[in-house]
């Protein structure tokens, strides 16, 4: 599931990244918790993970929250409850509740004089301009995009895993550069997701890249409900027992660093890149100046 805000809010969000990124998490989590506990929809406590992204394919500013939501939850009797494969919350209701909660927190921060206003957001210091912004955003239909995991939960983890510890753009998308410009690949969603090349001045490329550096010590991956640190060990074990799931064993348990690199990136650091021979650790003796271990084939 993806929670997105209207682009009209981008200037004020960018001027207050820590506060208004946190507000995205607050609104998304409060929406999911409130609706999931409602007996009209599911009537259970659920678990989910939220991840903040701030970029679009062209490195434009596009703050939104990705969520991975369990397919059910625990009811008041600690019994597992789901809706038989269908998502238990109506998309339209999610979007409306999320809109109300986010704009309510934004208004509260403005009333408490906790917001800053820079660049194109300066005009929102004025009460009437800010009210017009809120009115415009209330009138809009917000987007809460939901999609089932066609290839299983692991495919979702693999997809989002590409972005959780990266920022904005990867090296392979940078096609070329000169002293003045940078050309990089972008996905054109208006043309069936076709890849095309975009060329921008070097300073503009750096500006776009730096827009997506998160605030210092900001936590982008957050766990809620049954998946929170407080509940995960006991309640998730209980859920697995109810569903008859096999005990989870980490794929990294008792593996060496080299084995984990092989598993994650399919790169064998123990294989010589020159001759293809197997590398073995070589520890220097006490007469060797270097104190570091070397790999030799």
Language-model segments: residues:
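Beta->alpha loop/short-helix hinge microenvironment recognizer with preference
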Residues: 2-297
């Amino acid at each position: 599931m993806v929670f997105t805000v209207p682009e009209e809010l981008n200037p004020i969000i960018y001027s207050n990244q820590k506060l208004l990124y946190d507000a995205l998490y607050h609104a998304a989590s409060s929406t999911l918790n409130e609706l999931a506990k409602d007996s009209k929809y599911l009537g259970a406590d659920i678990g989910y993970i939220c991840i903040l992204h701030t970029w679009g394919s062209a490195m434009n500013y596009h703050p939104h929250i990705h969520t991975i939501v369990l397919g059910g939850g625990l009811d008041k009797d600690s019994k597992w409850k789901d809706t038989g494969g269908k998502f238990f919350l109506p998309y339209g209701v999610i979007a409306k509740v999320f809109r109300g909660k986010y704009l309510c927190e934004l208004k509260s921060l403005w009333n408490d004089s906790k917001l800053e206003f820079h660049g194109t957001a300066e005009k929102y210091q004025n009460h009437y301009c800010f009210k017009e912004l809120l009115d415009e955003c209330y009138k809009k239909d917000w987007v809460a995009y939901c999609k089932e995991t066609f290839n299983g939960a692991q495919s979702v983890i693999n997809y989002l895993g590409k972005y959780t510890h990266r920022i904005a753009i990867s090296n392979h998308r940078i096609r070329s550069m000169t002293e003045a410009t940078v050309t990089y690949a972008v996905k054109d969603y208006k043309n069936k997701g076709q890849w095309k090349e975009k060329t921008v001045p070097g300073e503009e490329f750096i500006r776009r890249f730096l827009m997506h550096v998160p605030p210092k010590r900001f936590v982008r991956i957050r766990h809620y409900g049954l998946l929170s640190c407080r509940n995960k060990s006991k309640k998730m074990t209980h859920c697995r027992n109810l569903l008859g799931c096999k005990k989870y064993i980490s794929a990294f348990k008792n593996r060496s660093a080299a084995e984990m690199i092989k598993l994650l990136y399919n790169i064998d650091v123990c294989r010589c890149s020159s001759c293809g021979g197997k590398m073995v650790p070589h520890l220097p003796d006490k007469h060797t100046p270097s104190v570091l271990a070397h790999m030799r084939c």
